[in-house]
From Swiss-Prot:
Residues 334-347 have a biased composition (Polar residues). GO terms for cellular component: viral tegument. It is found in: Virion tegument. Residues 423-441 have a biased composition (Low complexity). InterPro entries: Herpesvirus_BRRF2-like. This is Tegument protein BRRF2. Pfam families: DUF832. Keywords: Virion, Virion tegument. Residues 321-366, 378-398, 414-466, 486-537 are annotated as: Disordered. Residues 492-517 have a biased composition (Acidic residues). Belongs to the lymphocryptovirus BRRF2 family.
Length: 537
């Protein structure tokens, strides 16, 4: 009987038929994902390597049997189901390019020429919009894009990631490295980059960039699907042609019947078996015919209008960028500052912003009226620091909010900020501020020290008195800063080896301390210990 009636003849001994049949069945059904048209010949050689002589004829007959079974196999049928998706991807990319770069594309363009036009358009856009080294590096990535099962390099500057690129590269990795299967789940939206996946461009350039990138991603999807659909048939034909050349020295014939008759001539009673196949012999033009079904422009499957709607009407750069509603006028507030940040420079800036007293000037930022410890007050309060009071502002005085005078050393160590608040409106009278840290001390000395603190003068006395008051605050601030600039936290070691942090003097040779006679050297570490000693939280 002819091979066309009983199937394809395989010229191997019958005792190897079981292993070889299983191998070929796994390839035809697609159950073994490690098998492909490129490595099946090697797998067959490994299965029949004990066959004496006639190795090329045995492999040739096995490849020819697979070739005839391929068109109707489940392996190829699953790939044929992806042909509409490939056609849609190509048609969408083609129509998108006709819309944004009509001068560089035409209806007769091949997918490869379409890719070159898209790459050229993106390269020009990156150079014209920015041209920085990162953009120039992405130009090399665009130039390296190849049609086929290849990952996309970095092609979009000034972005961390792009979802369509990640999707396509994951798909390539799955097909090439993991040899997985492509599921029939195709949506043009997943290949359209969002506005945050492109550089920050003008609206018109952003629409152009997103459209070109969407066309590029659809075209890459087409190349991936095209290779996935046609790769097995092309690889199998190449292997068949090579073994035919090795066996006969001639190129592959045009008709498969020639190859079938050649193999039937080697058949005898104990060196062959038949692999059942259905239908006629598979022509050697099958890969080209399959490719012709894939490289098609079908307007009925085009999704270009959908992509354009996503770009121009969806949440993206095609519409005005998301803009926040205007914030209400903020009250005159200064950011919270630490006491060490309240220097004379800040007070000078406050004086510069005073303006005219007619009420038309901006709100005056409040000054932190820190109750400073004068040289005499510091000596009197060595026994402890009492409660600190703020002057009660008069009704006509500028609005000054209560400020925590000097935070406790523990709070200062933990970077606690003084609460500085302000308002352009008249502020109510404030009562005295409770002590920040409850420290031992004579109440009479505490009250005397608080009375020594200068209060904010009334605005009725004029700007001159206010200026004088500010200068007094500057001097007081400098005294406080000199007092605190020589502090550090030390620990007295307990019996168990633990330490409780205390403040002591630092012997600094800073210019701020060279002329300070009442600094750390006067009272020594003892006075500072008794004045500021606190356990560290």
């Amino acid at each position: 009987m002819s091979g066309q009636q009983r199937g394809s003849v395989i010229l191997v001994p019958e005792h190897l038929a079981g292993a070889l049949t299983k191998l070929m069945s796994d390839f035809i059904t697609g159950q073994d994902v490690t098998l492909s048209g490129g490595n099946i010949a090697v797998k067959i050689r490994d299965a029949i390597n004990q066959t004496p002589g006639g190795g090329d004829v045995a492999i040739l007959s096995s490849l020819f049997a697979l070739w005839n079974a391929l068109p109707t196999s489940g392996r190829q049928s699953s790939r044929d189901d992806l042909i509409p998706a490939a056609v849609q991807a190509l048609t969408t990319a083609h129509n998108l390019c006709l819309g944004v770069i009509p001068g560089e594309t035409s209806h007769k363009d091949t997918p490869e020429s379409l890719l070159r036009a898209i790459v050229t358009g993106l390269q020009k856009l990156w150079v014209d919009s920015c041209g920085c080294p990162e953009c120039l590096q992405c130009l090399k990535g665009l130039k390296a894009i190849k049609p086929g099962l290849y990952e996309i390099p970095r092609i979009i500057p000034h972005t961390k990631q792009c979802s369509p690129v990640n999707l396509l590269n994951m798909l390539v990795h799955k097909l090439v490295a993991l040899r997985g299967h492509v599921q029939l789940a195709y949506d043009a939206r997943v290949l359209t980059p969002d506005f945050h996946e492109i550089p920050d461009l003008d609206d018109s350039d952003a629409v152009f960039a997103r459209t070109l990138l969407a066309a590029l991603f659809h075209l890459n999807m087409f190349f991936i699907l095209k290779d996935y659909i046609t790769q097995d048939s092309m690889s199998l034909k190449q292997a068949l042609s090579g073994h035919w050349m090795s066996a006969t020295g001639n190129p592959l014939p045009a008709a498969p019947e020639t190859l079938r008759d050649y193999l039937e001539a080697f058949r005898n009673s104990d060196n062959h078996f038949y692999l059942p196949t259905t239908g006629p012999l598979n022509t050697f033009q099958f890969p080209e015919e399959l490719l012709g079904r894939v490289v098609v422009i079908d307007s009925s499957l085009c999704a270009a209008s959908h992509v354009q709607d996503v770009i121009t009407h969806g949440v993206g750069a095609g519409v005005p960028r998301p803009r926040f509603s205007a914030l209400p006028p903020a009250p005159s507030r200064e950011p919270q500052q630490t006491c060490s940040q309240l220097t004379s420079r800040g007070n000078e800036s406050s004086r510069r912003n005073l303006g005219q007293p007619g009420g038309t000037s901006p709100a005056v930022p409040p000054v932190c009226p820190i109750v400073s410890l004068t040289a005499s007050g510091a000596k009197q309060n060595r026994g402890g620091m009492g409660s600190l009071h703020l002057a009660k502002p008069e009704e006509t005085s500028p609005a000054v909010s209560p400020v925590c005078p000097i935070a406790s050393p523990a709070a200062s160590r933990s970077k606690q900020h003084c609460g500085v608040t302000g308002s352009s409106q008249a502020a109510p009278s404030f009562s005295s501020v409770a002590p920040v840290a409850s420290l031992s001390g004579d109440l009479e000395e505490e009250e005397e020290g608080s009375r020594e603190s200068p209060s904010l003068p009334s605005s009725k006395k004029g700007d001159e008195e206010f200026e004088a008051w500010l200068e007094a605050q500057d001097a007081n601030l400098e005294d406080v800063q000199r007092e605190f600039s020589g502090l550090r936290v030390i620990g007295d070691e307990d019996e168990d080896g633990s330490e409780d942090g205390e403040f002591s003097d630092l012997d600094l040779s800073d210019s701020d301390h060279e002329g300070d006679e009442g600094g750390g050297a006067v009272g020594g570490g003892r006075s500072l210990h008794s004045l500021y000693s606190l356990s560290v939280v």
